[in-house]
Regions:
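Phosphate/dinucleotide-binding and metal-coordinating scaffold of catalytic cores
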Residues: 1-112
Length: 112
């Protein structure tokens, strides 16, 4: 039997260079889950004030505003979409492609 969750696009979320969780696209929207081991680490910090540390998953019908805010804007967004041939309406695809090396503490690496 095929696990449908294996077909979801997802990325590992890194905070200050440490793997901290997974963001994924689901049939209902988006899910973000912190890694339980990360949550237990002394000094672990949340990705955002709107996504405090917890082991239960967060769900949203639209891309979480914090993650959407990591996506480049203006000419850089246009260049990203042109170079990687991304659909401009696919915000999650842009997030997974362009946010590997963001300014700040959070980055996302697409899982293959």
């Amino acid at each position: 039997m095929v696990n449908m969750e294996d077909n979801y696009r997802r990325g590992t979320v890194f905070i200050q260079g440490e793997p901290a969780g997974i963001i994924e696209e689901t049939d209902e929207g988006y899910r973000f889950t912190y890694d339980p081991e990360y949550c237990e680490k002394e000094g672990a910090v949340a990705a955002s004030l709107t996504l405090p540390l917890r082991t239960r998953s967060y769900f949203s019908e639209v891309l979480f505003p914090f993650f959407d805010g990591l996506i480049p804007e203006g000419w850089l967004l246009h260049m990203t979409q042109e170079i990687w041939k991304l659909d401009r309406r696919d915000r999650f695809g842009v997030l997974l492609s362009a946010c590997r090396d963001c300014i700040g503490d959070v980055s996302i690496i697409k899982e293959e």
